[in-house]
């Protein structure tokens, strides 16, 4: 005789197997897609239809294989492994992005709380955010006369707008009930800011931060390609192109994509952690 407990136990097995199957699908299907893309790319390259090397060139080209196996290589000057090139670019991104986050969130809150200020500044913000990052490079070089501060400025001016605009929108979307409660409780401005404005606007702020971190990474790569004589993965790509090291470029592009993905995931994790602990 089958008991109710056994029925429940047997009934739970398919759901457990289904969960494991879903987890495996979440891993195997993306891997299958990537593998299929690499195979098609290699076949297309081997057929002679293009001069673009296939993914196997990362292992068959001696110089590229050295870069792949020895990312911490440092011969001094600009001759560094991809780890150090990436770290140099990330350092600039961290500086420019941090400045953009501080200014973007602060100004965004002010603009979101003040309708007249928003009406006065919004057209200027919309105008400036439409300017491509590369267009700022010559202006930054003329203004700062040095590559490092110019690169940081390009990152800042690229990243600040999505942070500022999303923060302002988040503040404007605060429910009126929250504001009414704050008035009834006679909250001070600082307490209103910390207890009402920031928690309510936080999802919008992090949306802006996620957009901005991706744009910052794209901007520094583009800026470093234009700027000469600096350590960074963007200049590494341009230098490899000048010397016709196409396999090196492909490896650097893989680094760029992987780092960009990690940056986005880090900001998403930070958002979940902060919201969970508030």
Curated annotation (Swiss-Prot):
A single GO molecular function term of this UniProt record = nitrate transmembrane transporter activity
Q: Where in the cell is it found?
A: Cell inner membrane
Q: GO cellular component terms?
A: plasma membrane
Q: Where is it mainly found?
A: membrane
Which GO biological process entries does UniProt record here?
A: monoatomic ion transport
Q: Which family does it belong to?
A: Belongs to the binding-protein-dependent transport system permease family.
Write down the PANTHER family for this protein, in alphabetical order: ALKANE SULFONATE ABC TRANSPORTER-RELATED, MEMBRANE SUBUNIT, NITRATE IMPORT PERMEASE PROTEIN NRTB
Functional summary from the UniProt entry: Part of the ABC transporter complex CmpABCD involved in bicarbonate transport. Probably responsible for the translocation of the substrate across the membrane.
Name recorded for this polypeptide: Bicarbonate transport system permease protein CmpB
